[in-house]
């Protein structure tokens, strides 16, 4: 389940009101960006957010993963993984996890698009050192 607490309106899950989000999740979003996001956001069927995800191939844990974390510092993420928090239970099982911090809100593609693009390119290029992978201004 991605988020079964999102409100269903007229049979779909729309982009919620901004008040639903923690203030940190909205970091970097100007009023103009928020209006543009709302104008272009598409509603999704309820099961997209609330339906169970069934994964069965254990080989997925052998695929290296890069997490570009915009709302949570690496230390907090790794602590949650170590403690078995359900939010990151699947991630904690992955053998090789690289975390790249990109401090901003939930939508880095809108608040820091150039920095996000640079971090993705570095991750795809196989950059394993988080500091080197995030060699962009913060």
Please report, for each region that a protein language model flagged, where it lies by residue:
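Active-site rim elements
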Residues: 21-25, 104
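Conserved serine/cysteine hydrolase catalytic core
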Residues: 32, 42-103, 107, 114
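Catalytic active-site module of serine/aspartate enzymes centered on a nucleophile-bearing elbow/loop
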Residues: 94-138
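A contiguous pocket-lining binding segment that forms or flanks enzyme active sites
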Residues: 24-40
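Generic structural signal of hydrophobic/aromatic residues within well-ordered alpha-helices
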Residues: 21-22, 37, 91, 125
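Short amphipathic alpha-helical segments, especially helix-boundary/capping motifs
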Residues: 9-14, 27, 90-96
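Serine-dependent carboxylesterase/thioesterase catalytic core
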Residues: 1-22
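Residues within well-ordered alpha-helical secondary structure of globular protein domains
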Residues: 39-43, 122
